[in-house]
């Protein structure tokens, strides 16, 4: 493609264009790839020399302002001598010459926004007032643009200012909380008179003879008199004398405008109220007459000698005669809201009225007595200047339409030399919270195809997103508030980010709600709209055209990245979830090799490289940089070699895009406050512009870090910056709704062009080499070999420069390896290295493999490094446990022999391979299935041939990952869930062919860190077990569901977006701290995730609540579907309703070797229990079909009180992940793997609560344990193993804290349920004593941490309104929280012991311990209490005469639950066994009796585990021998 990417610059195109312009010949296209970048320190001849402070300030000048922040008539004024109009725009006063359409600018010396201004009667001076604490009243010379005087006399802001007609005095009125009214002698800089006003003052006006002035406001019209005699005698400040106007029956009105009469009406005063009343006061301050304007609201007033103009709502300006208040006419209305300015080519279009159109309200008026022009400012931030000499033929002199709310982003349209351009050269685009995208062009000689419209000389086109016009008017203009008060705003409105495609044909935009839209730029039609994210889209980026593939990446506050293929109608290629917080920037890099770089508020930078797989392009992480500061933005230079990152500590860090190493770090802001929010590199790669939260903009030399220029002017933080392609302008946008166009000085422009020519000279002298993939797979990062680098002046190079020239070749010429045996290496986990580590590596920068070979004997110790390989034991993960995170497996050129050496990489794959190789069927055959990628069909096309929606193609996993799916996944889906699931799993087996080179995703617990004493090899071995048994069958929903861990209730994915917050008014007036913090909330507080925004951990940590299993999230965005799949498949298996759970006695043990076939899923992980461990069971497949049929017949029943005692796990997952604040790359590497970024196994982490001591009397915890735990805790003597391979377990040195032991251990089953109760003691089998002694009981202080919420007892009857639990259930929950509530224990009858004794499957027959009896008594007591509470609740519902829908639903669910319990008891013969068993009888130690809690009764399952162990031992031995 020959287009320029909007987010980056094509160097060859820019060089050729600039070269041809300088040579005076037409430019031509060159398709050659750009050469490598010169080293960062080479550019010395073109660097600007250090300059004094004044020179730095003047190197960049403000050329044009597109925006206005005037909120009332106090922000608009007119020069009575020349007719120039002055208005406020942030911290700048814009003086406009309407005739010539030229602007002059006066900058406020401080960074406080301006609130009011007024011209002097002679037009030489302007007085301004400020916002903020201790504001200053300043006098400016209009011609010189310098400050003449400043006066400090207010505390909280200035509402309005005015010159006296004789120019002796200036009057300033403070805000309501300031309450100070000052009369200044501005030439002497003293306060002549002062007084306090208790009410809010909105406007003031001087009389023509300067003897008095009038202030109006809330129920306030007051005349203030200046006595010249008293003033001459008194040198100090005197009280200001005021008299109230006599309002009569209008005393309750709010007056918003005032003007003293002129000419023959000089003795009269005119006021207008919000309610639409025009009032006239005579010389005696008496209300003489008033007129109803017949409008819903009026806001401003302006008078001339003969006319009175009243600004009202809906664009109405009424005109009256001054001497008689006779109504004359109305001014023509401005444009209607939503007008297509591109169609307004004829002047008659302005006077065309559209039916039911809405017009913007008038908010400010000023009159030019010289030209008889009336200037009007409307509520949508538009300005019109009308010629009112003849009120019968009013004409428009000048107009402009600006953004009315925060401007979030700016993009410059690419330049083309042919006719492919959709927009004229020099066009730039801006997007705003007013839900518009605006196209601007300041070139008067632009393309004739785009004619100038009658509305604006610079605005070409306005795209109204979804035709929304409700946000076009500034919400800060309300009649019941002053300009100093904030207004809650719709935080979800507006376009947040946009990007132009490289070919200039498409415009991608993301809004505040997470929607992604694609517009085509020929006709501005919306092609695609998709709900992509659950929170606002923060960044968009198209890939570079040199790479040969066109991708679009979108990143959001929901911390997900979606990669779309533009060439496939924006089909979804991959979803990445590496980041643990909001993603602030994403960029594509590389020329032929596609690279993706992203940074976020989690202080991490991820470097990824693309790999071509059979099902599409996938990105694999190659480098991860963890900084100690938040990263807000980044940009890539023209050479695609360096990426500049804006950091919270006000530094700019420059990294190499290939190696991920930091090359430079320098200050990005000259101040000592705030954070860097934006960074942008110019088209030549010479300078970069930065914006700081202190509202400043800096221009910095990219190579030296020296500040070239710094600018101020915006009243809010700068949200976007772009250089133009001609290297002459810098465009900045801000939260003050203004767009500033800065003109770069000639020395800066010359320097940029010179650098482009130097790069062009380099390109002509070197021969680019072909870039190819390496043949065999390497354990290092894949990258292309660059061409030779030639420096500009080798004689002047320093040692760092020479090192930088040699570094790419050293990094990219990694030798290939035939074996998977990795080099010994240090895991660098904590920032910069100490000296010993640098000596170990041999160099500070270059860390190639040779350094490790030379230092094999040195073994460092400390928290900065740990051995990645330990002797003598080697595990099967040695070859890939570390390198797979950073080594992309290139699909092309991989031979079958290579694949054989790489795959399989986990025990499940090893099992399947061995089975095929031996020619017989193993017990584990059929347990592993490939992940299917269902297609939702091709996108539908509209009548223009474009897709009307974004099709979700197959999930972006690394081709087809290995995964086990349990048939119960289908059982757990009801209603729409099952239909949606079946639709997603329609893909045929052809999708899984040819993709066997990819790895298996593993799942581990990520809520706690692993024990410090566990070795690296052991951790890797545990990870191998986790990866293997993530593919284990789970066909026993009953006992497994009793082990579900208690979880804190997380909000649904609908709530995973940024909450609405009260914000700043859309003007530039942040008069309260809440307003000043609004924009910073979107940048500096990206890391402060609220409770509704759970993006602190991995996707597996985001669990679905009990009440959301059977309801869809109403927002079906890509992120929602991605999260939904991960929630239902990554950590916890789908839970069955209570009435579908089968007791252990009722579950037949599978016989024979046939195991249920795994069903397909769309996630890359196996089913795990809630505590992160797998569960092995042996239920027959027929039970799955039976449960499925039950599911079709019975409504879903929630988890009732009968299961609350068994719902707890070893530890409740933490609600805040440790990854939120850590900067350790090693720690973040071990978090969950992205569904679309399979990077290898993750080190399993054991929850720390496993080591907590047992608390007697607490709840029984059902966790997986090994048979080795059946020995007594006191003597720790291991019991003989009844299954598995003894040699394997002995050689693996598995400890009690290993995760793999939990994965292989049989899950305990739920205790038997009985209906017989008494208070007599009962004996418990010793096997249960051992099991209970091995369990960990949680603390009884706060059961809410274990998930005992009200939503666990009663179902949610609808997706929106949960059923409130009755008092009985709330009482039960309250009792469970009280530690003393378990003091009086109810005990079952002795007959109950027979149920336990006679039930099959005890491990041992030892005498029960007293601790066990106490635990069992506690469980039985809670069971009795829960059953009694449920029974009482059911009786109460049955006895009630009037039941609502929720109560009827609760009654039905309770009845269904009771019926299910009864059926289970009858099926398991528990009641008969309880009647026949002798009381107080212990079971005989009969070796033939099978234990109830042992699920290994199936010989097939036992044989499978033994075979697993044997295969593992063989793999370890083979690996140790180096096979």
Curated annotation (Swiss-Prot):
Residues 1214-1225 have a biased composition (Low complexity). PROSITE patterns: WD_REPEATS_2 (PS50082), WD_REPEATS_REGION (PS50294). SMART domains: WD40. It comes from Mus musculus. This is WD repeat-containing protein 62. WD repeats lie at residues 109-150, 153-194, 196-234, 291-330, 357-396, 411-450, 490-529, 532-574, 578-618, 626-665, 671-713, 714-752, 803-846. The modification N-acetylalanine is found at residue 2. Required for cerebral cortical development. Plays a role in neuronal proliferation and migration. Plays a role in mother-centriole-dependent centriole duplication; the function seems also to involve CEP152, CDK5RAP2 and CEP63 through a stepwise assembled complex at the centrosome that recruits CDK2 required for centriole duplication. Residues 797-809 have a biased composition (Acidic residues).
